[in-house]
Amino acid sequence: IYYTFDSFFCSPRMENGVLGNALEGVHVEEEEGEKTEEESLVENNDNVDEEAREELREQVYDAMGEKEESKKTEGMSLSKPETAKEQESEMEKGGREDMDISEPTEELPEKVALTPDQLTETSEEAEGAAAPEGLNEAEVTSGKSEQEAADAEKGKSVSGTDVQEEHKEQVEEKQGEVIVRIEKPTEASEEQPGTTLGKDNTAVEVEAEPVDATAKPVDVGGHEPKEQMATSGNEPGKAVLNQQLVGQDVPPVEESPMVTTEAAEVGSEVSEKSEQEATVVSNDGAVNGLSAAGDQASVDPQPSAERVTETKGGSELEEVRAELAPSQEAKLPIEESEGAGDGVETKVAQGVTEKSPEDKVKIAANEETQEREEQMKEGEETEGSEEEDKENDKAEEETPNDSVLENKSLPENEEEEIGNLELAWDMLDLAKIIFKRQETKEAQLYAAQAHLKLGEVSVESQNYIQAVEEFQACLSLQEQYLEAHDRLLAETHYQLGLAYGYNSQYDEAVAQFSKSIEVIEKRMAVLNEQMKEAEGSSTEYEKEIEELKELLPEIREKIEDAKESQRSGNVAELALKATLVGSSTSGFTPSGGGSSVSTIASRKPADGASSSNCVTDISHLVRKKRKPEEESPRKDDAKKAKQEPEVNGGSGDAVPSGNEVSENMEEAENQTESRAAMEGTVEAGATVESTAC
């Protein structure tokens, strides 16, 4: 497992260095020690024999058996775990982040579609084609096996998870950009420069010869392609790689023997595969990027591969970029092809500086969404302002007018007044209780004054019965402690007379006013006597006498008013009795009214009125009967005198007892007459209908 992850993370970075430098023409500087060591290993490939190759195959088979046992215990996937897939994709994304390539790419919409079955078939063909390669293949594998063993031992100290975390951070920062970065190998890649990984977790280590820093840029007119590794499975070199990717299931492998076939074929089949490559790419429209990346990983820069990259044609470069662009466009198809057992992801070798059209479309869509959001915000602001205006209008409509406020203020003032009266009542009642508890004359007189004020409050509250009670309580206390000619008694009698008058008790009111006058007269007599006795200082008595004399006319007027009210009350009683008598005698009105109406109804047909005009005549008759109600009773005195005998049945010549009584009787008669007129109109309508029929 350790070797699997180690080779897993190192191979994409090596591929970045090779393919990126080939496309851009820029070479990565590496230490001189590594160059010399790698060159020496390449030279030693000539001394490798067939026995070394067989030993390496046995080691691979042993590693595969160990992998199967570890799979059973750990429950991991034989082909490739999902976690390894995600790590690989993230590693490859991170490897292409900072790659600076100025040439634009052409987009190919078609996706990678090579299945594991096809890879298996091509791997079988590749085995047959790899047999005649002979010594060159053996030499390459033997040299690589030695270097790979040394590198594998060195790589044990390197943690694959650290590299994974590093690339994860890079992928998260620039996930949507199609940029490939040439990144110098980390410690893991420096220690294991030749380690590559097949798709099915097969660790393939080859000797990577560093590219010269002064290498020339790509020759556009060349015909020797490195693109041969990206063509379809019909080519032998690719079939060998597919066998390497699919045929081996165990990741912890130190060397893959099938890599040698590709390395040997690079020099011999350059021209043939360049032609086949152009045709296959043009026909398919989209090359299997996964297999292309796997081939590039397995055949890392050897001298022959370096020559291929330097002489690659411009048309083939465009095809490489074209096949790399779709892999960035659709991550999902690539991941599906990985799950099917295809080769290493193609994203490692992407040399793109400009954003793909999909990214441009996404950017345009983001701009459109931002513009829409801004428009929505502006619309919300305008709607908010409109809502505020509506709320302000509603508030203005809800604000009451001045007249309404005044009308509301009136009840409030009344409530305040009522509140003040209630407060005064409470305070006076409390004072009354306090003074009554004291038995002194002064306290009792204060209690009497409290009763007097409580009576006045009751009068203001129109509670006349309560006022009468309070005045009587005050009067009883004053009579005990005051003299008969005291002015306080006169005042109490006067207030009591007013209360009786307001309560329509005119007899009692007249009596109280009379007593008040008597008290005042007594006071005046006493003052005259005192004035005669005090001959020197009579001015004070004279002033008081004058004041009392001024009060007498007012009290007498109150007495007269009470008497008149009493008389009017009597007249009102008589009027009510008369109305009651009129209502009781209204039983005679239907006959009299019916006779008068019948005579009128009999006259109309005599005038030759047609039955069609009867309806209009009814309305005319009703109007005539309503006129006495609308006219004032004073103007109809003559009519009343004529109609009284008819309505009252000859008993309307009664002699009135007085002018007022006669007027009241006339009003009662007018009411009875109006009732009779209404009843007569109803009967007239009935008679007219009968005649019309």
Curated annotation (Swiss-Prot):
One GO biological process this protein is involved in is:
DNA replication-dependent chromatin assembly
Segments for region (Histone-binding)? 29-40, 124-157, 374-418
Q: Which residues carry this modification: Phosphoserine?
A: 40, 89, 102, 157, 232, 304, 315, 327, 356, 385, 403, 409, 568, 611-612, 632, 651, 657, 662
Which Gene3D superfamilies would you find in this protein's record?
Tetratricopeptide repeat domain
One GO MF annotation is: histone chaperone activity
* One Gene Ontology cellular component annotation held by this UniProt entry: nucleoplasm
N6-acetyllysine modification sites?
K156, K199
Q: Which residue ranges contain the repeat TPR?
A: 448-481, 490-523
Q: What protein family does this chain belong to?
A: Belongs to the NASP family.
- Function summary: Component of the histone chaperone network. Binds and stabilizes histone H3-H4 not bound to chromatin to maintain a soluble reservoir and modulate degradation by chaperone-mediated autophagy. Required for DNA replication, normal cell cycle progression and cell proliferation. Forms a cytoplasmic complex with HSP90 and H1 linker histones and stimulates HSP90 ATPase activity. NASP and H1 histone are subsequently released from the complex and translocate to the nucleus where the histone is released for binding to DNA.
The name under which this protein is listed is Nuclear autoantigenic sperm protein
What is the organism of origin for this protein?
Answer: Oryctolagus cuniculus (Rabbit)
The gene that this protein is the product of is NASP
